């Protein structure tokens, strides 16, 4: 019998994966198939390209303007040509924006670095199944569209267009896409949005996403820190309210557990394909999770929040005290069928960096 167990395990493993291909962590099941359509790539930013798609002439560069139906398969941005981590590195003052099928407001609007799981641009490398960073930024989210797509880099920091700005922005980009004859009716459009808020979580939950319509949630990255203290709690619950629920049908009991860890985040960083953690800023943590096999479908609406559980009265009381205010930021990724709710208004560039460390003086002190 003991000799049959390995064979039985191998058979079951093979049978399961034949029915459940893991596209994000293995080769696509149709890699050998020569499909119709063609693969194309659009370049921008580098000196060989027209000046209209370089930061020397504009602060809003259209890095790709595509006709459909098609699907974006990869987007790459090179590091700035004069990147100096001491004097300047990419931060939240440059945004990635993507518009589908002629829409006037974007479906993707995030600080570039946060989109790539590099909040505030403080990482030297990130390694996940769907985005990575190492001397460049790459994303592999499939992004289908029917009529047209426009991919932009928008700089809204203090510098004007010109050579100085060009020297500190990504110096090269390409967008790879594959042309298609048509898209199935249930194909969603890729969306991503960024939020940041400081709040008393004992009194109010942090809202990472609130949207109406039909779609599925496929991932997020989150940062948390306390501007007053060198610690932050991980006892918050992550709640997914689907289709108007008053009690979330998907609720993870513990911030670290929802990202695949337990008993607090680990003492050292861990970057796995679908989940990961690393230190953030001076006294915080950052984590990411991609929902590949466990994407959260919704048909009418979805609200995603971070807050304490209903019975956690002690935590709620403790984190209603001003010294325990928490700062959260998040980038969420989802697919949406049809029009989506407007994305939250982007904060001014000067307000996107993590809030500075602050001293807290209790009321009543004589100074």
Question: Where do the protein language model's features map onto the residues?
Answer:
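Beta-strand-centric surfaces of beta-sandwich/beta-rich domains
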Residues: 23-367
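Positively charged n-region of N-terminal signal peptides that target proteins for export
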Residues: 1-4
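Bacterial N-terminal signal peptides
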Residues: 6-19
